[in-house]
Amino acid sequence: MTKPGNKAERHIPVLLQPVLAGLMPLIGAKVIDGTFGAGGYTRALLNAGAQVIALDRDPHAVREGQSLVDEFFPRLRLMQMEFSQLDRVVEEKVDAVILDIGVSSMQFDEAERGFSFQKDGPLDMRMAQTGFTAGDVVNRLKKDDLARIFKILGEERYAGRIARMIEKRRCVQPFLRTGDLAHAIEALVGRKPGDRIHPATRVFQALRIYVNDEIGELARGLFAAESVLKPGGRLGVVSFHSLEDRMVKRFFSARSGGCRRSRYLPEIEAVPATFFSLFKGAITASKEELQQNPRSRSARLRIGIRTEAECLAKDIKLFDFAEIASFEGSKK
């Protein structure tokens, strides 16, 4: 059992009640939680009577979650794995899949993981703790590619200015700490009194998404979920910024036959829908939840219900996403 004061216990999963209601019925259901994190959704699903296969690419999250495995054995399996590979962990179709996209609050709270500029730590940001770091990206990528990352993945209006500043500064002293990069961006862009959002927020978001290939991971995860859900099964996705939410919206729209094509393109044969939406649009946090959990402010939940149709092609182009240079191909 989780001990009082444990980080996992302090974690509050966002939109929990809408998620549970949207994935019902759960008694005896086989559910994949593709983003275990601190275990908030998994515990709630287990308490509702489900059998859960939980995945997380972060080895720390998997270690911390072993007490939950012991508590709910044999109804819980917890594995270190990217959720894009969830189709490899089941032999039979499942009743539901839930994905909570992005960094967990547990990762944000640990300064040494380097996800947050609010707590100074190394420029790391790796969820799986393997591969190149955010520091590698900042100190080694070409200026133009940095600007593109900040612009596309962070929707940062000052992307070019910030990239030029980074290129100039790193020649003298490389960026090694989150606080150093955040202060440099704030000094360049400025911050008006009363501004709620720190000027480095979007750059840090972009770096985290790039380091962990979160866009590619989400696309592959949506395709994988489509392949493992039984007819009537439900896919719930919680996202925290517009980039992710647009991808999820576009996926459900395309899979339900709702994607609009250009009038200049030739007509194509209609394909059977593999999903239909449980509700129109996205669910957001209630006033009560916003008061209890400010992190839920930007959360959006979309749920699709699987039809009997065969899976469609796994075409990454349906997301209409701009290409970004690979780390190896962009190093200066």
Swiss-Prot record:
Keywords: Cytoplasm, Methyltransferase, rRNA processing, S-adenosyl-L-methionine, Transferase
Enzymatic class: transferase
Residue positions binding S-adenosyl-L-methionine: 39-41, 56, 83, 100, 107
GO cellular component entries: cytoplasm
Reactions catalysed, as given in the entry: cytidine(1402) in 16S rRNA + S-adenosyl-L-methionine = N(4)-methylcytidine(1402) in 16S rRNA + S-adenosyl-L-homocysteine + H(+)
GO molecular function, one term: rRNA (cytosine-N4-)-methyltransferase activity
Top-rank lineage group of the source organism: Bacteria
EC nos: 2.1.1.199
Transcription recorded as keyword: no
One of the GO BP terms on file: rRNA base methylation
Keyword Lipoprotein included in the entry's annotation: no
InterPro entries named in the record: RsmH, SAM-dep_MeTrfase_MraW_recog, SAM-dependent_MTases_sf
Compartment(s) where it occurs, according to its Swiss-Prot or TrEMBL record: Cytoplasm
Pfam families with a match to the protein in the record: Methyltransf_5
NCBIfam families xrefs: 16S rRNA (cytosine(1402)-N(4))-methyltransferase RsmH (TIGR00006)
Annotated family: Belongs to the methyltransferase superfamily. RsmH family.
Function of the protein: Specifically methylates the N4 position of cytidine in position 1402 (C1402) of 16S rRNA.
HAMAP family, per database record: 16SrRNA_methyltr_H
Protein name: Ribosomal RNA small subunit methyltransferase H
